[in-house]
Swiss-Prot record:
E.C. numbers: 2.1.1.163, 2.1.1.201
Function: Methyltransferase required for the conversion of demethylmenaquinol (DMKH2) to menaquinol (MKH2) and the conversion of 2-polyprenyl-6-methoxy-1,4-benzoquinol (DDMQH2) to 2-polyprenyl-3-methyl-6-methoxy-1,4-benzoquinol (DMQH2).
Protein name: Ubiquinone/menaquinone biosynthesis C-methyltransferase UbiE
Pathway the protein acts in: Quinol/quinone metabolism; menaquinone biosynthesis; menaquinol from 1,4-dihydroxy-2-naphthoate: step 2/2; Cofactor biosynthesis; ubiquinone biosynthesis
InterPro entries the record matches: SAM-dependent_MTases_sf (IPR029063), UbiE/COQ5_MeTrFase (IPR004033), UbiE/COQ5_MeTrFase_CS (IPR023576)
CDD domains (UniProt xref): AdoMet_MTases
Amino acid sequence: MNQTNFGFKKVDYTKKQGLVNNVFSNVADKYDLMNDLMSLGLHRLWKDEFIRQIPNLNSHILDVASGSGDIALKLAKKARDRVNNISLTLSDINEEMLKQAKKKAIDLNLFQNLKFTVASAEELPFLDDSFDYYTIAFGIRNVPDINKALKEACRVLKPMGKFICLEFSKVKEGYMKDFYKFYSFNIIPSIGQMIAGNKEAYEYLVESIDLFPSQDEFRIMIKDAGFEEVGYKNLSGGIVAIHSAYTR
């Protein structure tokens, strides 16, 4: 039996996606609020830096694991302000999360040039060489087969297309590392219980972060998927990192 991690638990590979879906379906309506509380608002700064990695908004952009649409809607607003002709596809395997994204897009009057697709990052329903940019923020670690998702990213990007990934990473400095670990395992699940009524979902969250490969390990995985010019930039001392790469 093929096994993989669901947090610290070992589960059958075929069951992981359903378990992850349940986590996000159960917290979808509190997802944005929890992001603000857990990160003390820092996630907004991280995401602003992330979208700066996309200089050309006259582009076809695929946002995978789009969730409640934070990244895609930031890009859509920036493109509207610049009067750029952007084409954005928001893809997520969880329909409840995409519903949140659609609501936000309507509220912000940003629905134009947006497409919504329920799909797995491992099996994207798009032709080869379809997009100029592939973005994924805080989603890749939830994919059952990360290597397969990276190869799919490489497949759907045009030649010299750019892959950009924002993900929790490894803090290296001693005192900060210790504080971060304490905060993650003791404070975040408690906030999850108080606000979202779901401690287990946020225990999974911090466990999945703890198990995610280091910056350099993930860089090698991206390169092995077929990308070139692979690099990363640490933010907030390595709490998160922006990984980027290009297709041939």
